Amino acid sequence: MRFNWKKTLLITLDVALGAYIVVAFASFNKPKEEAPVCKKVSIDIQDETTNGFITAAEIKARLQKGNIYPLNKRMRDINARTIEETLGLSPFVKTTQCYKTQDGTVHIYLTQRMPTLRIKAANGEDYYLDDDNRIMPNSHYTSDLIIATGHINKWFARNYVAHVGSTLMASDFWKNQIVQINVLPDYGIELVPRVGNHIIYIGQLPQTSYVNDRKKLVTDYVNTKLDRLQKFYKYGLAQAGWNKYSYINVEFDNQIICKKRNLN
């Protein structure tokens, strides 16, 4: 009996084709596994209780406004870079980081800009300076910061008043003793203390067009005045009384000029 290879091959192909159709049909009708979605959003704000410029609720609202709040969205559709860029537009955010983990969590980590000085200028401008001497808008934030008042434009605030503030804040004594910096029309600097009913005048700040030298120049000048003032506090006011003088002028190197309080 002669074996029919052609017929056998056709039968084999038919069987294979049929099996493929069955498998393909079964696969087509099998319910697809759902794409993983974001089950949790973790928002971590560094120094939230200390600075308080932004809250997790405000971050959520900002992302919802842009329709990019990730909760319940498919993980593959969540763009971490877009979230970072959106939050980075806030004037109170310093750095942002967003990433996804396999458990369905989207992590958002932010650092806030650190305010160091509040400016309330005579021209009506009201804003903060941060630790990089950049301007921050006014907000609901409240803190025990030194306030700078008077004839201050934004350039002078960033390039000179900021260095006065940072010098005061660098000292445990002066950051608690001085509550206000006042800039006179001729750019002379007055300091208002917390203890003692007097005004301190330290003179006009030294100026330079060299940006890299400016901070050291102002810092050295202010520290020299504060060192002399602290000695006067210790050896003068401690005996004469904290409220004897209404005005203390430490502008000049070789003398301290005091104006007695008018008791009438």
Regions found by a protein language model. Name each.
Residues 1-47, 52-58, 62-264:
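Charged, solvent-exposed interaction patches on well-folded alpha/beta domains
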